[in-house]
């Protein structure tokens, strides 16, 4: 199994069942909770929604980067999901979203190398070709390799 300090294959689900924003965020949060990254699902989700209401996290190219800085996060982590349908997210390019990268960041403390990895993911998503590769990925390993190539 491929892994690093913020993501492993258990944190990637390319078959999310949800058809709306709330469902996607709940499914991704469940992954964090099941892997003991967060202590409280409802508390973390509340913090994610606070950020969502502040402005859209749809960055374009059918990708959204919801995130929460929360006291319920034990360790900075990333969880990735993809739906088979497109979901309206209020993205900057007006396109619906089907690929999601949820960042979970502790409210306090230094995120160190985890913060650098998260930052490098955001930089990669400025590349349209990288976005297309993620949307077309066939496996968790492929997603991992795309996100962490040269990290």
Where are the predicted features?
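Cytosolic covalent-transfer regions centered on His/Cys nucleophiles
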Residues: 1-151
């Amino acid at each position: 199994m491929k892994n690093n300090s913020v993501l492993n294959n258990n944190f990637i689900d390319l078959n999310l069942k949800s058809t709306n924003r709330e469902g996607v965020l709940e499914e991704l949060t469940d992954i964090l909770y099941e892997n003991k990254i967060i202590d409280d699902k409802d508390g973390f989700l509340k913090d994610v929604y606070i950020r969502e209401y502040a402005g859209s996290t749809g960055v374009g190219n059918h990708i959204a980067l919801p995130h929460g800085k929360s006291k319920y996060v034990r360790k900075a982590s990333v969880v990735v999901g993809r739906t088979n349908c497109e979901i309206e997210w209020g993205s900057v390019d007006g396109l619906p979203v089907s690929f999601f990268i949820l960042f979970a960041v502790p409210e306090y403390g230094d995120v160190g190398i985890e913060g650098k990895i998260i930052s490098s993911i955001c930089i990669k998503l400025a590349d349209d070709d990288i976005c297309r590769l993620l949307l077309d990925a066939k496996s968790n390993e492929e997603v991992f390799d795309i996100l962490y190539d040269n990290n």
